[in-house]
Amino acid sequence: MLPDIIRGSVNTSVNTAHTTGNLVLQYTAKVSFATEIDRYNWAGVGYWQPLYGDLRNVEDVIQLAQERDQPQYEGVGLVLKSWIFSMLTNAYGDVPYSESVAVQEGIETPKYDRQEAIYRGMLADLRRANELLTPDSGSIQGDILYNGDPMKWKKLANSLRLRLLMRLSEKDISLNLDGDEVSVRDAFQSITSAPETAPVFTSNDDNAALEYLGSRPNEWPRHTSRIGTFRTFKLSKTLTDTLKHFDDPRLSVFGDPTAASVEDGSRKFVGVPNGLTNDASGSFNGGPDFQSGLNFTRYYDEPDAAKGLIMTYAEVLFLKAEAIEMDWISADAQTHYQEAIEASFEQYGKSTPPGYFGQEGVSYPTSDSEQALEQIRTQKWIALFYTGLEGWFNWRRTGIPDIDPSVDNVNADEIPVRFRYPESEQSLNADNYQAALDRQGPNSINTEMWLLE
């Protein structure tokens, strides 16, 4: 059961990054045909059903672990539950949570919980997972993410806590911590100040990154898509121009030079503007041979080249750097910022180029906190490439990078901020669906959820 849960949820995250997340945050751009999502015509995204399906299995893992007194499995189940629910609530807002998998209790139409309550529940579950996962809690059979190591899962639990707490940075709420009501800032600090009892990622060896094996079912999920469809996903002009400006070696990891430039030996990278119509995108810069696509070998041809990313060490360092600049914790922000960038380079097998940190826009502005935060968040955006929808979730909070709406969008020049609830909810769970709309607002991609209010 556990391998199927891990593989299924990670694959859903990867597939949604490919088809939607990479486009809306302008890592990639769509060309030639079916450019609707890049133009914000978001009729529906295949996110809800598969993730709730995985959650039903997660609940079984947790219940069996409790019955059999297997704390390591309960801890892993709580981590997976929190991560999957974080994807759902961050994408939709209020969603079924407390009654979401209670069919066995006779609840076939679960209520939609408020997003604030879901966040409190996720943070509580991750704290409980941290307590359950110990060196003595036992190995974890079927663990295709961390090969059965409970301490790796413990680090993931606490790293996810940092991610969720940072997402609450604009909310004036208090959280329960050991019976006391504390601020979001203090909750964050309680983790970073306790590496012995609440460890987080300390190297790329801790990355929550599913390694694919190169054969079904354990292969990169885009490997089985149609090759013609894959080639309609190009590097975005936004990402390409940013990486070229910084002479950033990750450009050749994320994408390929244009076919024409490979032929003539010049090896040029040309990104495509987001949201062009089918005809305009297909002919941009002279056509497909003069546009840079995704790295074909890494993200299509070799089924075990890329990894399914949940969270990385680089992200943890960026979270800490941002927290330092926000006066949440005391440490050196510049050191964390530079180490985060170096960790991202290392993650992709690249060395930090000489002089990289001396460039304007990369060199750390120690006397300008606002500019420092912008650079931290820009570099974090780069590092979150293909990490589910995390780049989009982070942009909604920070507005970084400062991107323009896609060119020929059909959403009145508004960048979407949520997914629509699936149409099936309107008929199968109508009363609870309507109650969520009454609280949150219309079922629109432009409706701001509680996190964004």
Give, region by region, the residue ranges found by the protein language model:
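Acidic, glycine-rich segments characteristic of secretory precursors and extracytoplasmic regions
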Residues: M1-L25, A34, V45-G46, D60, ...
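Pocket-edge structural micro-motifs
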Residues: S9, S86, V253-G255, K380, ...
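A broad detector of the eukaryotic-type serine/threonine protein kinase catalytic domain
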Residues: V10, Q63-Q66, W381
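Structured, solvent-exposed acidic/aromatic patches
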Residues: Q26-L80, I84-Q347, S369-L373
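C-terminal functional modules
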Residues: E342-E453
